[in-house]
Amino acid sequence: AKGPIKGFWIEAGYVTKNRGQDKPGNQIFAPNGFRRFFGLKKGKSSSTHIGEIAFETETGPLVTKNYRENDNGMEKLTLPKPEDHGFGVYDGKVLVFEPKGKRFLLTVVELDDFERVYGHRLANVSRMTGGRRFGELT
């Protein structure tokens, strides 16, 4: 082991245009169980709502977004609107989440930079069915 887990990450891949064709998308599918990284538990009823996540970013407002179960056995993570936080788009980038008290600091990194910046901290890397990778940071 490389030490305690200090964060986690997921490759965004293609992001659906859930806000309309003219705006960058802000929802990604995460693997079943990804909620545990956020300290969330599976919903008790038939509701798809799992909980809320409070995000902090380097620029832009604090934002709280929903986390849901999806009917395809995956989980749906709604992120802050990328244009409000200097991220441009999420497509093809890596989303890094680091706990800060009750919030999560969201950093968005180009795929090429991710290995260089975080490569030495990667732990428990897994791959989703569609090929996107996710894992933890030490």
Question: Over which residues does each language-model region extend?
Answer:
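Intrinsically disordered, charged low-complexity linkers and terminal tails
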Residues: A1-T138
